[in-house]
Design a protein with these regions (language model features):
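Transmembrane helix interruption/hinge and helix-loop junction motifs
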Residues: 55-63, 231-236, 284-296, 492-495
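Alpha-helical hydrophobic packing sites
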Residues: 33, 111, 178, 454, ...
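Membrane-interfacial amphipathic helices
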Residues: 1-56, 75-85, 194, 208, ...
């Protein structure tokens, strides 16, 4: 009876089509997911019983544990939808360079399927490499022709830009349209599509500001006002809105476009950063600090670590911003008869960061090693190196291809700069948040003595600084922003 009841309420049986469609998009083993879901489903009654016991014994807030049951029950739908959305975002970021691969191949008489076969062995493409594996699987395992396999994948990707590429190619092949020209048109469209995605993100986070303001500023004020009738302050109730922080942060991660950072931290950097970790514990042990000061110390350690990551981001941006001019110079050298590698050896730049990158590239060429072995902390640069190497192997040193590549990359950089410019307001909000809390809580405490509320100022300021850093710079490691927030907090707490 229990088994039959479980089958009736099993989410796999209720919305199997939706889950299956999600899995088809990114590729997964549905039976493995089903077994995983069956195992974790038995946690639902356990959590319910624990929440009721803790509610009766300790506090009503333990009933909030039942929220976990919602996520467990909808786990198959949530996890497949998240993976699908992540795959879609990665693919959208990779499409411009992929289309340049396809464009070069079309000039050499190779079709789109051949491009996917090449991408399947790529070390750089992640989303499209997975897509290539699924496409090739339909041909090699299911016995479809490459044309019908692309038609099948077009249906899976209906509504996104990759689906449009599939449809455009298959329809173009049917009626004999020139594919190089059509792919160039798609290149322009994909830049427009990225622009729309960035614009949509800016609109969504601007709307989110109102929610953040209500939750993390107005709500604590209201809760504090309600506690005026009591002689004591319930700190848990005042910080209760912060429990929603992970959900909002997760939402921001879902709606954010992929900006392309691929930060790698080596083991030596991790070892160096570990030396400063004991500092907060030592200070706490020696000086018996209040909780707000302990939190501030740990926040300071986080900021130190963020400098390592932010430095890598800055270098990656510098390399990216100089690359269009270098590609244009390579095109000029190709015009007068140089090969791609000899053109790179002739290059000269002023930027310190790019000079180091170029030095690594020259070293690889002189050692006759793959150019794509030079890795940066930004995906699009790594992908362009793989594209250049691919073009060089094919002996297709075409001036116009490099000019087009330079133009596409320059448009991409302008889009990134535009969206970062539009999000600067969040940096200002993060910096002034401690000041707003200081004055708002200061007014409240003057009306009635309610004790020290420094902990509230610290917790909300740190939470919002991390949130705004994520929103405005697409990473929580926005070192300048975090430092300014820390300085404000120190001034407020100590002066």
């Amino acid at each position: 009876l229990r088994q039959r009841l479980f089958e009736k309420i099993n989410l796999f049986n209720l919305i199997a089509t939706r889950i299956n469609d999600n899995i088809k998009y990114y590729g997964d083993d549905i039976e493995r997911l089903r077994k995983e879901y069956t195992r974790i489903s038995f946690l639902i009654p356990v959590i319910s019983i624990i929440s009721v016991i803790f509610y009766l014994k300790f506090s009503k807030y333990f009933l909030l544990l039942d929220i976990m049951n919602f996520f467990i029950y909808f786990y198959p739908l949530l996890i497949t939808q998240i993976r699908k959305d992540e795959q879609r975002k990665i693919i959208e970021n990779e499409i411009p360079i992929f289309l340049l691969f396809a464009y070069v191949n079309s000039l050499l008489g190779k079709n789109l399927y051949k491009t996917f076969e090449e991408i399947r062995n790529s070390k750089v493409f992640k989303g499209l490499r997975r897509e290539a594996m699924l496409l090739v699987k339909e041909v090699e395992v299911l016995g479809k022709s490459s044309f019908s396999a692309m038609e099948s994948r077009a249906k899976v990707h209906r509504g996104d830009f990759l689906g449009k590429i599939y449809t455009t190619y298959t329809s173009g092949e049917s009626i004999g349209i020139s594919m190089p020209e059509r792919i160039k048109d798609l290149l322009n469209e994909t830049i427009d599509n990225l622009n729309l995605n960035f614009g949509s993100y800016v609109e969504k986070v601007n709307e989110l500001v109102e929610i953040l303001f209500m939750l993390f500023l107005v709500t604590p004020m209201i809760l504090l006002a309600f506690q005026y009738i009591s002689s004591t302050i319930n700190m848990f109730e005042l910080i209760f809105p912060l429990l929603l922080f992970p959900i909002i942060f997760f939402y921001v991660s879902l709606i954010q476009p992929n900006i392309g950072y691929d930060i790698k931290i080596n083991i030596n950097e991790i070892k160096k950063s570990l030396y400063i970790l004991p500092i907060p514990f030592i200070f706490t042990f020696l000086f018996h600090l209040n909780l707000e000061y302990e939190i501030l110390l740990f926040y300071s350690i986080f900021i130190v670590f963020s400098f390592i990551v932010y430095r890598k981001i800055s270098v990656a941006d510098a390399v990216l911003n100089n690359l269009p001019y270098i590609l244009s110079d390579i095109a000029d050298y190709l015009r007068i008869g140089y090969s791609i590698k000899s053109a790179i050896l002739k290059l000269n730049v002023d930027s310190t960061e790019f000079k180091k990158f170029l030095g690594e590239l020259v070293t690889k060429i002189k050692k006759n090693e793959a150019m794509s072995n030079v890795k940066t902390n930004i995906w699009i640069v790594n992908a362009i190196l793989e594209l250049i190497e691919n073009i060089d192997k094919k002996g297709f040193a075409d001036t116009y291809t490099f000019k087009d590549l330079s133009l596409v990359l320059n448009n991409y950089i302008l889009l990134r700069k535009k969206v970062l410019q539009n999000l600067r307001m969040f940096n200002i909000l993060a910096i002034i948040t401690p000041i707003i809390f200081y004055f708002a809580l200061g007014v409240m405490t003057k009306i009635k003595a309610v004790g020290n509320l420094d902990l509230i100022i610290v917790l909300y300021s740190i939470a919002l600084s991390i949130m705004y850093a994520k929103i405005s710079r697409f990473t929580i490691f926005n070192f300048p922003l975090l430092v300014l927030v820390l300085v404000n907090l120190i001034l407020i707490l100590f002066f």
